[in-house]
Regions:
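Cytosolic regulatory protein-protein interaction regions
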Residues: 1-73, 84-99, 106
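Intrinsically disordered, low-complexity regulatory regions with latent secondary structure
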Residues: 4-7, 29, 101-139
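Amphipathic alpha-helical elements of HEAT/ARM-like alpha-solenoid repeat scaffolds that form extended
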Residues: 75-82, 113-117
Length: 139
């Protein structure tokens, strides 16, 4: 009797490798898009409501969809999630980012909670997160 275990293990390993590579591409894309958000906001002084900013927020969300929820890659996504979240004006986009941040926060990373609190305070006040950090809000 012949076993296919080796072949099945190879296929499983190959599939895992493919998923990990796909996640790496998604993580990389989310960082590029977060960089564009910062470029347009800080250098070109576009408001959060700018269509360019909001399109990049949506593209960050699309890139995040390529990263498994609860996977190891997810813990590296605070910068793009926070960047997109602070600039998001669409309630559905905000909710999607908030949900994802809470999932990462559940992994026990307290700095994620602080970032989430700052992002929500930015939404509540309509102030930039930088203005809040320089002002009275410190987490």
């Amino acid at each position: 009797r012949h076993s296919n275990t080796g072949t099945e293990e190879d296929q499983t390993h190959s599939e895992r490798t493919r998923l990990e590579l796909q996640e790496m591409v998604s993580v990389n894309e989310s960082f590029h898009l977060a960089g564009l958000i910062h470029l347009h906001r800080r250098v070109f002084c576009l408001p959060s409501s700018s269509p360019v900013i909001q399109e990049n927020v949506k593209l960050v969300l699309k890139a995040l969809s390529g990263v498994r929820r609860g996977g190891t890659a997810e813990s590296s996504l605070l910068f793009p999630m926070f960047s997109a979240g602070c600039e998001a004006t669409d309630p559905a986009d905000r909710e999607a980012i908030l949900e994802r941040l809470k999932l990462v926060e559940g992994l026990g990373m307290t700095y994620v909670r602080n970032a989430r609190n700052l992002m929500e305070k930015s939404w509540e006040t309509g102030k930039s997160w930088e203005g809040l950090v320089k002002g009275e809000f410190l987490g």
